């Protein structure tokens, strides 16, 4: 009888401890304690919003174990923010394995920046997966590591250009610009000024001043007044977008017109 009472008392104590740990969400706490992943995920987010990071870690880890993939990412991000790259990598991997694109991207960041180990091959692998899942920033980052190479990855400018184009398709202005440069200069792709013009135009129209400058130069280099006039217009667009270099080039081009 005494043993039964002791076991009951212990069970009550555990329940009370759980309630206290997860207060002020006792219902979620109870459901989470019983293994309900959705409740653990909700509880973890609640704890995060209240600044209770230890409670959040406990709840999110249970949610992650129960198959809540977004909680795996949230937990990875929490550890990442604390500077614990090793634990961040564990939970980013768990979420990436469940096709959470941003988690694959963050994992690629850890490898690219050397916070786990500096391994561009691993970074590229995770960026490509995130890119394939529709995360445009990862397409851009995959292009960057392929363009430079190193740290276990052979440079491949042709691959870099293809990923810059995919990033551009996803609306990233710097990807459009870099793809434009590749076609303009013949880096990793056949030199194609018409294709460069299209890519620069898209980037410039999205507010990327350097693309406006390069587009302006393409028109000016045609050597006729109409081309110069169009080029001036694109450079002015870069200036209007706040690009100081564009403004300087614009003023210089206007001076050239006045001298003629």
Which functions belong to the PLM regions below?
Residues 1-12:
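N-terminal Sec-pathway targeting helices
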Residues 42-49, 74-81, 106-113, 141-149, ...:
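Hydrophobic face of amphipathic alpha-helices that form TPR/SEL1-like repeat modules
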Residues 237-260:
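Terminal, low-structured helical/coil segments at or just beyond the last alpha-helical repeat
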Residues 50, 82, 114-117, 154, ...:
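Structural motif corresponding to the intra-repeat A-B loop/turn of tetratricopeptide repeats
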Residues 35-36, 47, 66-68, 98-100, ...:
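Short helix-capping/linker turns of helical repeat alpha-solenoids
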Residues 37, 53, 85, 120, ...:
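TPR-repeat structural position
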């Amino acid at each position: 009888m005494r043993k039964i009472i002791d076991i009951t008392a212990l069970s009550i104590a555990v329940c009370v401890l759980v309630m206290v740990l997860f207060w002020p969400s006792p219902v979620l706490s109870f459901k989470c304690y019983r293994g309900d992943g959705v409740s653990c995920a909700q509880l973890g987010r609640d704890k995060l919003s209240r600044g209770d990071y230890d409670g959040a870690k406990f709840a999110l880890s249970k949610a992650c174990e129960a198959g809540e993939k977004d909680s795996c990412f949230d937990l990875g991000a929490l550890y990442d923010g604390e500077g614990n790259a090793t634990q961040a990598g564990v939970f980013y991997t768990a979420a990436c394995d469940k096709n959470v694109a941003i988690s694959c991207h963050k994992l690629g960041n850890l490898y690219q920046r050397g916070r786990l180990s500096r391994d561009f091959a691993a970074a590229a692998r995770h960026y490509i997966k995130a890119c394939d899942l529709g995360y445009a920033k990862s397409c851009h980052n995959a292009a960057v590591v392929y363009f430079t190479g190193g740290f276990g990855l052979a440079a491949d400018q042709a691959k870099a250009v293809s990923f810059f184009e995919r990033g551009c398709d996803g609306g990233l202005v710097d990807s459009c610009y870099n793809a434009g440069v590749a076609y303009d200069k013949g880096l990793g792709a056949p030199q194609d000024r018409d294709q460069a013009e299209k890519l620069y135009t898209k980037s410039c129209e999205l507010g990327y001043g350097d693309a406006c400058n390069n587009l302006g130069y393409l028109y000016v280099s045609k050597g006729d007044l109409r081309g110069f006039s169009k080029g001036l217009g694109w450079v002015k667009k870069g200036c209007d977008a706040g690009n100081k270099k564009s403004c300087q080039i614009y003023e210089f081009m206007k001076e050239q017109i006045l001298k003629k």
